[in-house]
Amino acid sequence: PQLKAPMVDVYELTNLLRQLNFKVVSLLDLTESEMRNAVDEFLLLLHKGVYGLLYYAGHGYENYGNSFMVPVDAPNPYHSANCLCVQSVLKLMQEKETGLNVFLLDMCRKRNFHDDSTPNIVLRVTANIVFGYATCQDAEAFELSSTSFINGVFVKFLKKRLLDDEKITVVLDRVAEDMGQFDATKGKQALEIRSSLSERRALTDPVVSGDGHDLAHVHSRQWAKAHELPESMSLSFDCGVQIKLGFAAEFSNVLVIYTHIVKKPADMTFCQAHDLDVDPKEMNRETPEETGIYLLSSSLPQHCLYTRLSSLQKLREELVFTVCLQGTFESMGEEPPIHWTKSVNIRKPLIARLDLHRPVRRNSCLQTCLMPHSPCHSPGPEHHAHLYHQAPDYSRLLSQPHFLDVAELPLGAVGGCGMPFGDGTSPCGLSSSPGRFSIPIEASDDINEVQTVFINSLQLQPQ
């Protein structure tokens, strides 16, 4: 069965890190090239003294002390050339002279016997590196399965401690102690911590302004660019119906669109969704849960129709969709319904603005891990990009009681950065206010009588 914990874990860690004034980019199910480009964008947020944190949940392995994150398009069997080396990301972070580098890796650390290459990664000697591994070397990571959406084992305990005003290694030590008391994973999974931290560095260190304020402002604009939501809008049809469209971000590459009827003519007797050849599985549903929106549902307005659009990082051109109505009036008698349509262009929302689908740049993390047969030395055929989220069926809830299962995880990652005070450099301020929500003011309870297909055809329109 599809496991659900990574999506829940990424969502909750995103909210916790934002409370700590981190700029957070949260992404799910990326291909290899998308992962490498996402790392490039993450690095743009870093500069001298900034605290950088990377959380990853998904398939992974460890060879010769190096950890590898496996993208969704990796072949079977996969090798290091198909994956992203965590230590190569660390090397690039060190080049930014960051104040703290934290890696939280919620993945298996078994040896990959299909991969015999030895990475040649030369790291600087810096006393600011912390690794929190969800499991021990050469061991597997687990998650609990149940009839509801719950956290993985690591984040189940991490989220209770992450906001503590303590040195990050102290926080992880306490998480390890908590995990050690958990009967379900005793003897199967234990948190491992590796650290070179020589000073008291905490994720709660205050964010202050300093000489690097201008640079921080530039980086904040870069982050804001990837989290800009479309403006809510009102659509008026010739028939007298008025519709409100609103937008929310579930993740940096997942957009939620919700709509409701604001006004309709009193003599309208029938109005329903236009039946077109579009898969309605995640479109125009009366509850967020029907579309797979389990985590954001409590934050959305009620009495709407909801659509969930994922895989935004694959969007190459502006996103155009058609809002379609069909209905009848009292005066029409037995005549067939009339159709009305309007085209809506929301350009490139959220992470789509950063074009993660682009070819990998030559100065990306490919260059930090010189391995035989790596893409930068022996280019192979490009992976075909499949729809993001790979449509894992999160609606299939397990009926069994809690049990342990090997982490066959859909990929999820959180990258965050913040500039706390505490390192003698010139710290600068980074605001981490979450992306703007466009919430319509009006609402209607009359959803059964008047329905709208606000995305019945997705089109790509040249910029």
PLM feature spans:
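Cysteine endopeptidase catalytic domains of the caspase/legumain-like
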Residues: 1-463
